[in-house]
Amino acid sequence: MANVVNREFDIRGVNHLALVCKDMARTVEFYRDVLGMPLIKTIDLPGGMGQHFFFDIGNGDSLAFFWFPHSPAAVPGISAPAELPGGGDIASAHGSMNHIAFNISPENFDAYVEKLRSKGVKLGPVLNHDNSPNQVSAVVTDDVFVRSVYFWDPDGVMLEFASWTHQGFKDSDVAHEAVDADGKKSRNVVLKAPSPVPAE
């Protein structure tokens, strides 16, 4: 795919994602001590409103958590998926965040899967995403574009370690029309849309 640039805003990636946890201490133990993410900022919100903590996820990006004293409980299958990919239904409600994928290098993928297992993290199957009808290959082939393993954090947030297996995408990688709210591909939004303006 041609190198494209946003001519409207100088957006430089994700600053942070903000989630809500049930137990901030348990969240710190998981993200800092199990996943090794440095805790870079802690905030006690004014008036006993709660807490807001930030973890460094690399490249200047952060993952943040709020703790509120009266947050409602999680509702798996509505606010988050009920199952890991490869194990069942992964749908979640409109407006929900389905999962967070952390980018890891292809060279570290298999070792990191084993490292998570050794730390007692329950993992879904390793998925080699490809362009086949099943969209998953049992082995890594030239058609595999990303390798993934999924797992839960202590609050039921689905996490993914994802590794791109090739550099860059081609125009042919954008080959599916978007569906509307009724599941119909009737609006020609993607395939008939004008191409983005290439970078100069």
Regions found by a protein language model. Give the residues of each.
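Core segments of cupin and vicinal oxygen chelate
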Residues: 20-72
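A short, polar/proline- and glycine-enriched secondary-structure boundary/capping micro-motif
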Residues: 74-79, 170-173
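Vicinal oxygen chelate
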Residues: 12, 24-25, 82-158, 166-170, ...
